[in-house]
């Protein structure tokens, strides 16, 4: 399943915006590492609690039956009552440490089962509960205490063997009918406790796995928000140390908000951030619509690349369409003071190198002469225009209308002939210009 990128903040019915999903995801991820162990312990405690209450029901039922029928003597009923009370307080012992509650439960169960089996004989089936305890002991003490669990299971096996060889099938303490009833009830209740406990443990584990899957999806969304999907997948490969790719053809765009410094100094911080969030979120939607890749945002500068990391033959045309839509979207916006938001946009094309750099807060970036030229096209551009060099003009002239600006001096490149991108040609009439179609893009 593809991870969804964090986009524009959801818009409520009253026009207000909620915090973007990515902020919530970051907060959740920050809490997640400290929760996993605690949740594992809590699951084990819940399993022990449900097992203890099932045991209370079983031992309490036996005590009531023995008191009502008088079969087995009052002290057998007393053992069951004492055992049921002890089981009932087991959930209260979790606060004293991870092993106090399970060891109290298991120890009490072992003593009670052995005492009853010794008094009434093996035909009553009390020893079956030892087998249930051996099967459930890992769930109760935890997998991190495997050696202890094995030891407790061995004790259960030893007690079963001891009863078999040391105690007669029927000691005569209970009448034959009571022994038969005890055997049936013991068999049914032992199976019931085992099935119920395992079912509850598996259900709790399934819920925990669903939570982990949701956390994984949030992690994937955060990673997809930082890196292109294909790059993110390559970054997960354990043998991959460096990600660096050369592209013989790609197009680069830089856009800058004109007069941003003055706006920032005269606008409240919260209003400025909300404005930039709306603007850049709208641009992000356009990037996705055109199948491009946003590289970075630096203050009021927005950088987009086409043909990276997925090469495409129409990379220049796609970026030109995006530039026209971008200026159209910006024209629909007003800053917090109600002023228009003019842009300067520059495009360039050529070979580039792209890769992931940094060991902390790593990022995906693009380098090359085309990047430098696109930046110069933006910085030397006129307000509200999209400036391109001659190489871009040659690629766009058949499908777009461009107006020559002339020759300008570009730092590091000398004199360059540049053009203004006006719009896309209409197929029916090459002389007619079609500007960018109006797009709201969530603004």
UniProtKB/Swiss-Prot annotation:
Its cofactor is Mg(2+); Mn(2+). Its EC number is 4.6.1.1. This is Adenylate cyclase. Changing residue 43 to A/G: Loss of activity. SUPFAM superfamilies: Nucleotide cyclase (SSF55073). The gene is cya. It comes from Mycobacterium tuberculosis (strain ATCC 25618 / H37Rv). Binds 1 Mg(2+) ion per subunit. Is also active with manganese ions (in vitro). Belongs to the adenylyl cyclase class-4/guanylyl cyclase family. One of its GO terms (biological process) is intracellular signal transduction.
């Amino acid at each position: 399943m593809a991870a969804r990128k964090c986009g524009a903040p959801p818009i409520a019915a009253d026009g207000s915006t909620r915090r973007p999903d990515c902020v919530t995801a970051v907060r959740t991820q920050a809490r997640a590492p400290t929760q996993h162990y605690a949740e594992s312990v809590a699951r084990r405690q819940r399993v022990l609690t449900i097992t203890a209450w099932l045991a209370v029901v079983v031992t309490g039922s036996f005590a009531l039956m023995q008191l009502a029928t008088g079969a087995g003597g009052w002290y057998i009923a007393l053992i069951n009552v004492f055992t049921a009370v002890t089981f009932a307080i087991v959930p209260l012992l979790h606060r004293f440490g991870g092993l106090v509650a399970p060891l109290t439960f298991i120890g009490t169960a072992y003593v009670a089962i052995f005492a009853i089996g010794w008094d009434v004989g093996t035909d009553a089936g009390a020893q079956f509960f030892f087998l249930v305890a051996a099967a459930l002991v890992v769930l109760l003490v935890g997998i991190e205490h495997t050696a202890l669990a094995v030891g407790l299971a061995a004790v259960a096996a030893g007690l079963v063997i001891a009863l078999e060889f040391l105690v007669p099938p029927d000691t005569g303490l209970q009448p034959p009918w009571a022994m038969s009833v005890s055997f049936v009830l013991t068999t049914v209740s032992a199976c019931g406790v085992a099935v119920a406990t395992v079912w509850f443990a598996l259900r709790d584990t399934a819920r925990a796995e669903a939570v982990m899957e949701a956390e994984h999806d949030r992690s994937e969304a955060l990673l997809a928000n930082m890196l292109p999907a294909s790059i993110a997948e390559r970054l997960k490969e354990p043998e991959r140390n460096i990600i660096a790719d050369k592209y013989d053809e790609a197009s680069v765009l830089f856009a800058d908000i004109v007069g941003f410094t003055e706006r920032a100094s005269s606008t409240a911080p919260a209003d400025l951030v909300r404005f930039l969030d709306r603007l850049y979120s709208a641009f992000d939607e356009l990037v996705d619509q055109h199948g491009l890749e946003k590289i970075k945002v630096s203050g009021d500068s927005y950088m987009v690349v086409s043909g990276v990391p997925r090469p495409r033959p129409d990379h220049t045309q796609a970026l030109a369409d995006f530039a026209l839509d971008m200026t159209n979207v910006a024209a629909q916006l007003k800053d917090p003071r109600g002023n228009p938001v003019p842009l300067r946009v520059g495009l360039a094309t050529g070979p580039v190198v792209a890769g992931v750099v940094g060991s902390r807060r790593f990022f995906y970036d693009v380098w090359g002469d085309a990047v430098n030229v696109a930046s110069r096209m933006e910085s030397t551009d006129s307000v509200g225009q999209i400036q391109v060099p001659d190489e871009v003009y040659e690629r766009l002239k058949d499908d777009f209308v461009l107006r020559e600006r002339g020759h300008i001096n570009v730092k590091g490149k000398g004199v360059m002939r540049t053009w203004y991108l006006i719009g896309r040609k209409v197929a029916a009439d090459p002389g007619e210009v079609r500007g960018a179609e109006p797009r709201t893009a969530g603004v």
